[in-house]
Amino acid sequence: MSAITITDAAHDYLADLLSKQNTPGIGIRIFITQPGTQYAETCIAYCKPGEEKPDDEPVGLKSFTAYLDAVSVPFLEDALVDYATDRMGGQLTIKAPNAKVPMVNEDSPINERINYYLQTEINPGLASHGGAVSLVDVVDDGIAVLQFGGGCQGCGQADVTLKEGIERTLLERIPELKGVRDVTDHTNKENAYY
């Protein structure tokens, strides 16, 4: 069974679009750009015969084939393609709740694990102050170099947040991490929360 659900209404709408292309065997290709990041976008494109990638996962539907990009498949889990009619005609919608969820485990590279915890545990708390922190690099055998932005840049509490919140959380979650270092220019207090 496929990771994605294409409703009958979406199937019929897409089949009608494909029939107008006058290309026998044309299907669709579903993929996610920048999967597992906050910038992830789920896309559907025409896929003429021969344009599919060798590692795509073909999903045979009643009227056409949908090719799922192999890299995108884990991020398409629980995805739904639907078509809803309205007074203006209708709209094709794609809901992929896992598109932006990083896929990491203890074997993932250290920078991916750091980014995962920054996005899922640290930044949601900082967002309440209009701030965020991002990974610049990992140096010196396990020191995470971080940069604050938004309300955290220039904030008088940034050092406390760094040591008591961010560093503690990351060290608990990533045993081989040795510490964190802030490279933010905190002299710019224009957007500072405190």
Swiss-Prot record:
Lineage: Bacteria, Pseudomonadati, Pseudomonadota, Gammaproteobacteria, Pseudomonadales
Keyword 4Fe-4S: yes
GN (gene name): nfuA
Residues that bind [4Fe-4S] cluster: 152, 155
Originating organism: Pseudomonas entomophila (strain L48)
Role: Involved in iron-sulfur cluster biogenesis. Binds a 4Fe-4S cluster, can transfer this cluster to apoproteins, and thereby intervenes in the maturation of Fe/S proteins. Could also act as a scaffold/chaperone for damaged Fe/S proteins.
Oligomer and partners: Homodimer.
Listed cofactors: [4Fe-4S] cluster
Homology family: Belongs to the NfuA family.
Entry keywords, A to Z: 4Fe-4S, Iron, Iron-sulfur, Metal-binding
Cofactor binding note: Binds 1 [4Fe-4S] cluster per subunit. The cluster is presumably bound at the interface of two monomers.
NCBIfam families found in the cross-reference section: YhgI_GntY
Entry annotated with the keyword Iron: yes
GO terms for biological process, alphabetical: iron-sulfur cluster assembly; protein maturation
Listed name of the protein: Fe/S biogenesis protein NfuA
GO MF annotation terms: 4 iron, 4 sulfur cluster binding; iron ion binding
